[in-house]
Every structure is written in structure tokens, then in C-alpha cells.
Amino acid sequence: MFDVTANGASIPALGFGTFRIPGPDVLRIVPHALKAGFRHIDTAQIYGNEAEVGEAIAASGIARGDIFLTTKVWVENYKHDAFLASVDESLKKLKTDYVDLLLLHWPNEAVSLAEQIGALNAVKEAGKVRHIGVSNFNTALMAEAVKLSKAPIVTNQIEYHPYIDQDVVM
């Protein structure tokens, strides 16, 4: 498998997503994904399986530095203090002291984008994440996020397939 590079991040092009995979199934399936050669594992706070993802990675025998781990902060945690606490909780569940990529899961107008991006930058500066990004942002929000961020926004993770044309965002 090959990597793509974006703003200093080298990201495995093909990742194994854990959306809608219950915890017990994660414990069974993620080891097979790792054995098959996947080195990018994607999870999120809202998926409810971060602990099992962390357990599967820890038990894999693969060095943590050889796995690219992505998680996402859920919208209810976007206020600065809640954001910081939720990242610490995610790291504990994932059994690691950093994630390779941390994303804002969805846009949330209830919290200013400046506060959201500020929190992303704070956890990056603290060494808890290597790279930051967003998910499901439209082009205007993405442009604003880039302007607000001290650190590079390395990705806007979106759903893209023949039934969802997102060429405008791409």
C-alpha cells in the first residue's frame, strides 16, 4: 500500500474504517485488517469503539509508530475545555499518548469555528496529535478553518463514491 502526502503528513492511502462496527467485532476484525496490511485505522468518539480499537492495536504486535491512527472529536465536545478532556479520554481508550490525525467530525454552528480550530491547535501543540483536520466541511468552512489554524489542516475527510458526488468539495 502507498502513502499520500498532504501538508507534511504522510498518510496511508487506504485506511480501515470502524464506523458501525460494534466493539466485540472490532476485537475480531481489526487484527485481520492489520494482518492483511492495513496500517491506517480510522475510528471516532461517536462510534463507541475506541477502546476496542486501542486494544486490538496494542495486541497486534505491530509497533505503534507503524500504525497511522485517526480519530474524530464529536460535536458535543467542541467547547474548548470539553474538547481537551475528550481528547484525553480518547487517548486513554486508544491506549496511546498520541494520534496521528485528529478531526472535527462534523460542522457545529453552536460553537465558533475559531474555538474549534483553537482547540485542535492546542492538542497539537501539546503533542497529543501529530496532524489535524476536519470532516464533512463544505468548501467555505474548509477555507475558513485553514485561515484560522496555526497548524496545517491536512485533510477534509468526506464520504465519496458513485452515489455521492462531492466533486465541488474535492
Task: List each language-model region with its residue ranges.
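CE4/NodB-like, metal-dependent polysaccharide N-deacetylase domain
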Residues: 83-103, 122-126, 147-148
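N-terminal binding-site loop/beta-alpha segment at the start of enzyme catalytic domains
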Residues: 1-67
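Beta/alpha (TIM)-barrel catalytic core signal, keyed to glycine-rich beta->alpha loops juxtaposed to Asp/Glu
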Residues: 107-170
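A short, structured active-site edge motif that brings together acidic residues
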Residues: 64-77, 98-107, 136, 159-160
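Conserved, mostly hydrophobic/aromatic
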Residues: 16, 33, 41, 53, ...
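Active-site mouth loops of central-metabolism enzymes
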Residues: 12-24, 71-81, 110
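Short, acidic/polar
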Residues: 21-34, 79-95, 113-115, 140-144, ...
